[in-house]
Amino acid sequence: MAESMNKIFIAIIAIAVAAAATKMFTSEEPKSKALPVLVKGEYMQFPLVSIKKLNRNSAIYRFKLPTDEHVLGLPIGQHITIKAHIDGSEVVRSYTPISLDSEAKGYFELLIKSYEQGKISKMFTSLKIGDTIDVQGPKGFYEYTDRSSKHLAMIAGGSGLTPMYQIIKSIAENPKDKTKVTFIYGNVEEIDILLRDDLDKFAASKPGQITIHYLLDKPSENWKGGSGYVTPELMKEKLPAPADGVQLLVCGPLPMVSAIKRSAVALGFPKAKPVSKMNDQVFVF
């Protein structure tokens, strides 16, 4: 009897060991955790790996991170600072990447519109594959989460699109994010509308939740969107009225931003502060 029980016990142990070994060799490796690369207050260099031309003066520049497991480490809505030495002087400018840490492992992307008087933006047009840029971050006082607001009213002009694009993309790709977005995006001509296909795709993915209104200064005869400037009347017609849970986000050329801030006050929004903070109802990037 004792011998029989010993045999049963040994058999049970053997089965358990075999099962454990099978699990050890067949289980999937745990997914490696993304490694943020940015260190606040420190400049880091990243090499250019590709350029995608969008139109006559805009392109997407992709830069490589140290490994494919690294992410930039930038909260949604924040920006980086780029430093360059141009004509004997140090020049610093801020840019918001269009890539999100949730998808961009091993790289980050910047949408750059080159302006005639823009020293850094013109510097980008001279970059060649393998050239590096000096980057510091994260910077900024806005950090989007799906609990930030119930309804985001956005207004942007030209390359001021980039922080809005990041936020809209995050909302569109998160099934649990129910934040409403109403976005007025102004440009000079139709060719100047940046990442339009992506924006239309985001809106189509959540109809009724994400709404985008295009506005042109110089529309063609066949243009079916809006025309002119962002006026108080247009804001009142297209955007939500000021209320709890509504936040107005603004980014673009200084004259446009100044006019929008005045219009927002006329519509009942509080006056924008000189430096916007996360909980301000009017936030200027």
UniProtKB/Swiss-Prot annotation:
Catalysed conversion reaction: 2 Fe(III)-[cytochrome b5] + NADH = 2 Fe(II)-[cytochrome b5] + NAD(+) + H(+); 2 Fe(3+)-[Dph3] + NADH = 2 Fe(2+)-[Dph3] + NAD(+) + H(+)
SUPFAM superfamilies assigned to the protein according to its UniProt record, in alphabetical order: Ferredoxin reductase-like, C-terminal NADP-linked domain, Riboflavin synthase domain-like
Q: Looking at the record's lineage, which domain of life comes first? A: Eukaryota
Its gene name is CBR1
Protein name in UniProt: NADH-cytochrome b5 reductase 1
Between which residues do disulfide bridges form?
none
Main location as per UniProt: mitochondrion
State the organism of origin.
Answer: Vanderwaltozyma polyspora (strain ATCC 22028 / DSM 70294 / BCRC 21397 / CBS 2163 / NBRC 10782 / NRRL Y-8283 / UCD 57-17) (Kluyveromyces polysporus)
Residues binding FAD, per UniProt: 125-140, 151-183
What EC class does the entry list? oxidoreductase
Summarize subunit and interaction data from the UniProt record for this chain: Monomer. Component of the 2-(3-amino-3-carboxypropyl)histidine synthase complex composed of DPH1, DPH2, DPH3 and a NADH-dependent reductase, predominantly CBR1.
Enumerate the UniProt keywords alphabetically: FAD, Flavoprotein, Membrane, Mitochondrion, Mitochondrion outer membrane, NAD, Oxidoreductase, Transferase, Transmembrane, Transmembrane helix
